[in-house]
Amino acid sequence: MAFVKSGWLLRQSTILKRWKKNWFDLWSDGHLIYYDDQTRQNIEDKVHMPMDCINIRTGQECRDTQPPDGKSKDCMLQIVCRDGKTISLCAESTDDCLAWKFTLQDSRTNTAYVGSAVMTDETSVVSSPPPYTAYAAPAPEQAYGYGPYGGAYPPGTQVVYAANGQAYAVPYQYPYAGLYGQQPANQVIIRERYRDNDSDLALGMLAGAATGMALGSLFWVF
């Protein structure tokens, strides 16, 4: 950060309206700082021109003030601040007054200063678009044209036949097999009765013996 303009100016006090000589520095960030003297040890006040200043008057435009002894009003300038404060200044000459006026006006309106730059950065951050995505993942409705079926299919019917010819039906619940899984169907199961008594076993042996004797007689004839 560097000086834009420096020099002596007469400043009128706000209470006693007396003129006092101060050293002024205008910095490149738009701050106008004035000191007791050129050593810059004691700061009396400072003004941020881009943010605090709303108008600059020169010469006959200056209000509610009179120039110091030996100076004309054309050497005067006033810095009107946003908070209502007015800083009345007087330069060494008319040319010096105009030089200060143009420099201060430029620092107040130049967007390269820090105050305006910060506002520009905040605006760009707020209004910046979201990051670009080359291949966005489609939603399930867009990929397939319909959403997945979330419910279970209705249960099928299981029909069971006993060996005595009687049939009875029981519900059979199929688990959900996905979007393209197997659909439920009706199943038929024939279940034979288990023979575990002695009479059934004897009848089977007798029938086998009779069959063997008949076959033996047939072979004996030939």
Curated annotation (Swiss-Prot):
Compartments reported by the entry: Recycling endosome membrane
Keywords: Endosome, Membrane
Binding site for a 1,2-diacyl-sn-glycero-3-phospho-L-serine: K20
Pfam families, A to Z: PH (PF00169)
Topological category with respect to the lipid bilayer: Peripheral membrane protein
Entry's Gene Ontology molecular function annotations: phosphatidylinositol-3,4,5-trisphosphate binding
Annotated InterPro entries: PH-like_dom_sf (IPR011993), PH_domain (IPR001849), PLEKHB1/2 (IPR039680)
Main location (coarse class): membrane
GO biological process, one term: regulation of cell differentiation
GO cellular component: membrane; recycling endosome membrane
Annotated ranges, domain PH: 2-109
Biological role stated in the UniProt entry: Involved in retrograde transport of recycling endosomes.
Domain notes: The PH domain specifically binds phosphatidylserine, which is enriched in recycling endosome membranes, it doesn't recognize PIPs.
Name the record gives this protein: Pleckstrin homology domain-containing family B member 2
Organism: Homo sapiens
Lineage per the UniProt record: Eukaryota, Metazoa, Chordata, Craniata, Vertebrata
